[in-house]
Curated annotation (Swiss-Prot):
Residues that, per the record, bind Ca(2+): K79, D82, D84, D87, D88
Annotated protein name in UniProt: Alpha-lactalbumin
Gene it is expressed from: LALBA
Function summary: Regulatory subunit of lactose synthase, changes the substrate specificity of galactosyltransferase in the mammary gland making glucose a good acceptor substrate for this enzyme. This enables LS to synthesize lactose, the major carbohydrate component of milk. In other tissues, galactosyltransferase transfers galactose onto the N-acetylglucosamine of the oligosaccharide chains in glycoproteins.
Segment forming the signal sequence: none
Keyword Repeat: no
One Gene Ontology cellular component: extracellular region
Length: 123
């Protein structure tokens, strides 16, 4: 599913403030990682990253490509490609709690300041 900034902000509002990260930061990260598209899969050095949050099949989820995954989120990676963001958010929060926000490489260079553009005007 291709989200818009405002629709995604609505879906992710319960993540605002989790681990000290604002909703605008999440929206910015997701834009740069997946373009707000839930069906994004990126192959990288033999690993794959899935969905809005680009969650990795080596550590966080399991797929047919990497049966040795640590699968910390205890989930099949393809669950991150559907329209239901409940499991995506759960795993992203787990990643944030364990690894910190810089797990998402877009954060530091692109999403740590000037965040007004990532806010939905409705609020």
């Amino acid at each position: 599913k291709q989200f818009t900034k405002c629709k995604l902000s609505d879906e992710l509002k319960d993540m605002n403030g989790h681990g000290g990260i604002t909703l605008a930061e999440w929206i910015c990260i997701i834009f740069h990682m997946s373009g707000y598209d839930t069906e994004t899969v990126v192959s990288n050095n033999g690993n794959r990253e899935y969905g809005l949050f680009q969650i990795n099949n080596k550590i966080w989820c399991r797929d047919n490509e990497n049966l040795q995954s640590r699968n910390i989120c205890d989930i099949s990676c393809d669950k991150f490609l559907d329209d239901d963001l409940t499991d995506d958010k759960m795993c992203a929060k787990k990643i944030l709690d364990k690894e910190g926000i810089d797990y998402w490489l877009a954060h530091k260079p692109l999403c740590s300041e000037k965040l007004e553009q990532w806010q939905c005007e409705k609020w």
